[in-house]
Amino acid sequence: MEIILIKPVRKLGKIGDILKVADGFGRNYLLPQKLAIRATEPNKELIVKQKHEFEAKDKQIREEVEKINALIKEQKLVFIRQTSDDGKLFGSITNKEIADKLSENVSYNIFHSNIILDKKIKSTGIYTVEIRLHAELNAIVTVIVARSESEVQDYLREQKNESLETLAESA
């Protein structure tokens, strides 16, 4: 299937690119998500005319996302949860919970589908989580899972000491 991208798609292309993709990928993902349109002759002509408009809109979105990124990258999300004696959570922390807490902290809607989490967080500790804000921009946040506030402070002190040791070794 031949398609024209109307939004940038990670690892695929940018606005206005004409690509051949698998039929299922085009029909089941790109077209319904309004990331692309079919590459017919009228659509090709239309895209040439509207390419600047799409690029301007994407630039505006990217600027907005960069503002959000500036707010997000300094965030440390703290989850206080009950655990067993060996530090395993009763339950887990999912990408939805991370998105909700992050949205609450930065006053922007972050969707759980934007949180890149290989597997659910099931034990205490410090985790780095990637957030996909735009096709070309990801942010990293720190997630701290602990039993109590004092344990959170211990984790933060440990992390600070490790970063100081790393600086001392590199100097």
From Swiss-Prot:
Question: What is an annotated GO biological process for this record, any one?
Answer: translation
The superkingdom listed in its UniProt entry is Bacteria
- One Pfam family of this chain: Ribosomal_L9_N
GO molecular function ontology, one term from the record: rRNA binding
Q: Which UniProt keywords apply?
A: Ribonucleoprotein, Ribosomal protein, RNA-binding, rRNA-binding
PANTHER family (alphabetical): 50S RIBOSOMAL PROTEIN L9 (PTHR21368)
Q: Report the protein name in the record.
A: Large ribosomal subunit protein bL9
* Species of provenance: Rickettsia canadensis (strain McKiel)
